[in-house]
C-alpha cells in the first residue's frame, strides 16, 4: 500500500446523504492531502438498523457527489454482498486494497465514532490499512485542526420527511428531488 495516490473513504449509511457529509468530504479534499474522496455507502447497517434500499442510497450519493469536484462514489460493499463480513470496514478496506493495489487509503470518521471503535470488527486492521482522518462533531470533544461539522443527522432528516416537514438546506437539492420522486422516507 505504498506510493500512488491517496483516496479518502467517507463511509456511512447515507440514509440519506446530507450537507454535513459533503462538508466533511470538502474538508478532507482541501486540507488532508488526498487526491479524491469516495463516498462509500454501507451495503447494510453494521449494527442491523433498517436502511433504504442500497441502490437508492448509492444513487443519492452519486447525486450528492456531483456538487464537489474530486468526490466520487464507491459501491464496493455491494461487490461483497455474499461475504459474511460485508459491512465490516476492515473487510471493505482489504477488498479495496486488493482491487486498487497502487492506491493508499484514508478513512474519514467523525469524532463520535472514535468512542465506538471497541465495537468495530478488527479496528487494529482498519488502522493498518488506512490513515485515520478525524473530523469534529458538535457535542463531542474538539479535534485539533479539524472543524466541527454541524449537528445534522440522517435520522432527524428522515423524521422530518416522515412528518412532511421541509428539509431544504439539510440535504443537497438533487438528493431532495430524488427522495421526493422515489417517495423515500414517507411515514
Curated annotation (Swiss-Prot):
It catalyses: nicotinate beta-D-ribonucleotide + ATP + H(+) = deamido-NAD(+) + diphosphate. Its EC number is 2.7.7.18. It comes from the Bacteria. Pathway: Cofactor biosynthesis; NAD(+) biosynthesis; deamido-NAD(+) from nicotinate D-ribonucleotide: step 1/1. GO terms for molecular function: ATP binding; nicotinate-nucleotide adenylyltransferase activity. Coiled coil: none annotated. Keywords: ATP-binding, NAD, Nucleotide-binding, Nucleotidyltransferase, Pyridine nucleotide biosynthesis, Transferase. GO terms for biological process: NAD biosynthetic process. The keyword ATP-binding applies. It holds the Pfam family CTP_transf_like. It is an enzyme of class 2 (transferase). The keyword Repressor does not apply. Belongs to the NadD family. NCBIfam families: nicotinate (nicotinamide) nucleotide adenylyltransferase. Catalyzes the reversible adenylation of nicotinate mononucleotide (NaMN) to nicotinic acid adenine dinucleotide (NaAD). This is Probable nicotinate-nucleotide adenylyltransferase. It comes from Anaeromyxobacter dehalogenans (strain 2CP-C).
Amino acid at each position: 500500500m505504498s506510493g500512488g495516490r491517496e483516496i479518502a473513504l467517507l463511509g456511512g449509511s447515507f440514509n440519506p446523504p446530507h450537507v454535513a457529509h459533503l462538508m466533511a468530504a470538502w474538508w478532507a479534499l482541501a486540507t488532508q492531502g488526498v487526491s479524491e474522496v469516495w463516498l462509500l455507502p454501507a451495503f447494510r447497517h453494521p449494527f442491523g438498523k433498517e436502511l433504504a434500499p442500497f441502490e437508492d442510497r448509492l444513487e443519492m450519493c452519486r447525486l450528492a457527489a456531483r456538487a464537489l469536484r474530486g468526490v466520487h462514489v464507491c459501491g464496493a460493499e455491494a461487490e461483497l454482498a455474499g461475504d459474511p463480513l460485508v459491512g465490516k470496514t476492515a473487510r471493505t478496506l482489504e477488498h479495496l486494497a486488493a482491487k486498487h493495489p497502487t492506491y493508499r487509503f484514508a478513512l474519514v470518521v467523525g469524532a463520535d465514532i472514535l468512542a465506538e471503535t471497541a465495537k468495530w470488527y478488527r479496528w487494529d486492521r482498519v488502522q493498518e490499512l488506512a490513515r485515520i482522518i478525524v473530523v469534529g462533531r458538535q457535542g463531542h470533544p474538539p479535534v485539533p485542526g479539524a472543524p466541527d461539522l454541524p449537528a445534522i443527522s440522517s435520522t432527524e432528516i428522515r423524521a422530518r420527511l416522515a412528518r412532511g416537514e421541509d428539509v431544504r438546506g439539510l440535504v443537497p437539492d438533487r438528493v431532495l428531488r430524488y427522495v421526493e420522486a422515489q417517495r423515500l422516507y414517507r411515514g
